[in-house]
Amino acid sequence: DLTVTQWAERNRRLSSEASAEPGPWRTSRTPYLREPMDAFTDPKVRRIVMASASQVGKSELENNIIGYIIAEDPGSILYIHPTTIDAKEYSKLRIAPMIRDCPTLRRKVAAPKSRDSGNTLLQKTSPGGILTMCGSTEAHALASKPIRYVLGDERDRWATSAGNEGDPWELAMARQTTFYNA
C-alpha cells in the first residue's frame, strides 16, 4: 500500500495554472507536508487538522490526498470551501488542471466534454467514487448523502451555519457515520 507521499512522488504533476514550479511533485520542496500527507493513510489517524500560514502547500496537500483517493482508495469525497464561488474557482483552477496533467487521474475521471461524463464543475466521478465540491452554506450538499472522506479548505472563512441547518462541519461529519473506515 502506498502512502500519499509515495503516490504523489510517483504520479502527481503540478500544473502551470496553479504552481510557480510546474512539473513533477517533489516532497523535498515542502518536507513539512510529508507527515500530514502520510497521516492520511495511517489507520490510527481519524482526523487531520492544520493551521498554518498562507501559501505553504496546504491546498496541494489536499490535492495529493484527493488524487490518492481517486487512484488508490476510491470513495465518496466531500470537499468544502467557504462559498460555492470558491468551490467553482478551485475546481477550475486546481482540480481540473490536476486531473488533466496527471495521467493516472486522467484515465479515471472522464473528460468534461464527453456526453454523460460524470465530470461537471462541482462533481468529478471516477470508478468507485465521486468528488463533490461545495460551499459551507450549502446544507443540501453537506447533509444529502453518505460521505467517506471530508476535506475542508479555508475553515476560518466558512459560514457559521449552513442555512438553518447548523454548523457546516458537523453536518459533513454526520455523513460519515455509515463508513467504518471514514
Show which residues each predicted segment covers.
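Phosphate/NTP-binding elements of NTP-utilizing enzymes
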Residues: 1-182
